[in-house]
């Protein structure tokens, strides 16, 4: 009788040594994100974090998100260093809408076969996003699952927790007719609409390496999502913010109403800002209607802020000083009956 060959976890497709190599590779990047509230070091069963002592009645705010099919482009064109920033941005930009300061972040990286170099690049991007937003990368999960993913494919998910003073929560209840709307510029499509973007590339048979306004089209499409946390925390301290809307999936039509009272609508002047060239390219090459553009993409606006009209000039000056491109794009008006809550004129 032949003795069966002894099997190992590695024979089944899971390389523990590769996982350990990844942890060693990312230690310095993760350490850079540490906050004073974090207790212990990377690698424990559970990550510990104290609440900052400056809060009298702290309220925790949580969010989870992914990068969607933008990952498909990143994988196909082997550009893995920015999707980690995207992952963090999608979470922390949701938290700041409530006025919350991000505290800590955890990531989930899943793949069929762990490529240490690729994973190091991705997680380093996650650490960079955490650094930009001032939150600690305190843990995560790297799942190597043979048979679950094809080839070099991987998927990402992120989870973030922030904190806000209970009395300072921004929830849209203060919004009223006469408020002004400020927009913060996006860096591109951010992390939404990529299934349509990929369809436009397929139908138009465009070369993603073609030049568009001085750089390859693919670089426009993979530009990382802008993180607005630090400038908005400063704005919140110095102004009276009534509401903020993170313009993600669903675009203007679906995200702005999420922070408006039922008796209010947003009137947006569509010519008050210039679309980044990548959106013009998508609209033309995909023959996409303008309504569909505003439903699918941010069209150059990553965040919309509602505030009293008398606060606009100071807010624009502060945001500009913080390196943001910001514009006055409209106002809040009284909604009549069952009118749409967003009107683009």
From Swiss-Prot:
GO terms for cellular component: cytosol. It catalyses: 2-formamido-N(1)-(5-O-phospho-beta-D-ribosyl)acetamidine + ATP = 5-amino-1-(5-phospho-beta-D-ribosyl)imidazole + ADP + phosphate + H(+). It is an enzyme of class 6 (ligase). It comes from the Bacteria. One of its GO terms (biological process) is 'de novo' IMP biosynthetic process. Keywords: ATP-binding, Cytoplasm, Ligase, Nucleotide-binding, Purine biosynthesis. One of its GO terms (molecular function) is ATP binding. Its main location: cytoplasm. Its EC number is 6.3.3.1. This is Phosphoribosylformylglycinamidine cyclo-ligase. It comes from Shewanella frigidimarina (strain NCIMB 400). The gene is purM.
């Amino acid at each position: 009788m032949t003795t069966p060959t002894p099997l190992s976890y590695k024979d089944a497709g899971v390389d523990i040594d590769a996982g350990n190599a990844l942890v060693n590779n990312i230690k310095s990047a993760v350490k850079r994100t540490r906050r004073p509230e974090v207790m212990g070091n990377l690698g424990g069963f559970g990550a510990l974090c104290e609440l900052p002592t400056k809060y009298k009645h702290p309220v925790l705010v949580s969010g989870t998100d992914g990068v969607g099919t933008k990952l498909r482009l990143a994988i196909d064109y082997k550009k893995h260093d920015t999707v980690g920033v995207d992952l963090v941005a999608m979470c922390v930009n949701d938290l700041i809408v409530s006025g919350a300061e991000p505290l800590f972040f955890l990531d989930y990286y899943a793949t069929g076969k762990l490529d240490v170099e690729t994973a190091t690049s991705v997680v380093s991007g996650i650490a960079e996003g955490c650094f930009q937003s001032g939150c600690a990368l305190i843990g995560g999960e790297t799942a190597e699952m043979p048979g679950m993913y094809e080839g070099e494919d991987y998927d990402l998910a992120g989870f973030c927790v922030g904190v806000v003073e209970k009395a300072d929560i921004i929830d849209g209840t203060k919004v009223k007719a006469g408020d002004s709307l400020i927009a913060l510029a996006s860096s591109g499509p951010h992390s939404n609409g990529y299934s349509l973007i990929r369809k436009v590339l397929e139908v138009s048979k465009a070369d993603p390496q073609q030049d568009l306004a001085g750089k390859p089209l693919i670089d426009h499409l993979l530009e990382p999502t802008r993180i607005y946390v630090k400038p908005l925390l400063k704005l919140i301290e110095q102004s009276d913010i009534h509401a903020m809307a993170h313009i993600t999936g669903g675009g203007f039509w679906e995200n702005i109403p999420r922070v408006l009272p039922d008796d209010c609508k947003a009137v947006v002047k569509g010519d008050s800002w210039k679309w980044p060239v990548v959106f013009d390219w998508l609209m033309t090459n995909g023959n996409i209607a303008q309504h569909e553009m505003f439903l699918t993409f941010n069209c150059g606006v990553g965040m919309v802020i509602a505030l009293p009209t008398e606060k606009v000039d100071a807010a624009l000056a502060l945001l500009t000083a913080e390196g943001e491109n910001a514009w006055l794009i409209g106002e809040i008006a009284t909604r009549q009956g069952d009118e749409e809550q967003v009107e683009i004129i």
